[in-house]
A protein has these predicted regions:
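Ubiquitin-like/PB1-type beta-grasp interaction modules and other compact soluble beta-rich domains
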Residues: 1-79
Length: 80
């Protein structure tokens, strides 16, 4: 029983992969525990967003993923 993590943009570079499977269920603290180093720090930044099965979470600390879910980690958007 797993949850698929998808790392978009520069978060994929920090994670060293575009996708990774982790054990379900997965909450915010479990996600932080799974992601160590620069990727873990980046995910905790206010501007980094999380989508659960394609829907952006208003409060990423409310993450509650179960087996078969996809959690996408979105880097801050920049532009001019």
């Amino acid at each position: 029983m797993t949850v698929k993590l998808v790392f978009l943009g520069k978060l994929g570079d920090l994670a060293g992969t575009d996708e990774r499977s982790v054990e379900a269920p997965l909450g915010w603290q479990g996600l932080i525990d799974e992601l160590q180093g620069p990727i873990g720090e980046a995910v905790q930044q206010d501007r980094t967003r999380i989508a659960l099965n394609g829907a952006l979470l208003a409060d990423k600390t409310a993450l509650n993923a179960v087996s078969g879910d996809e959690v996408a980690l979105l880097p801050p958007v920049s532009g001019g």
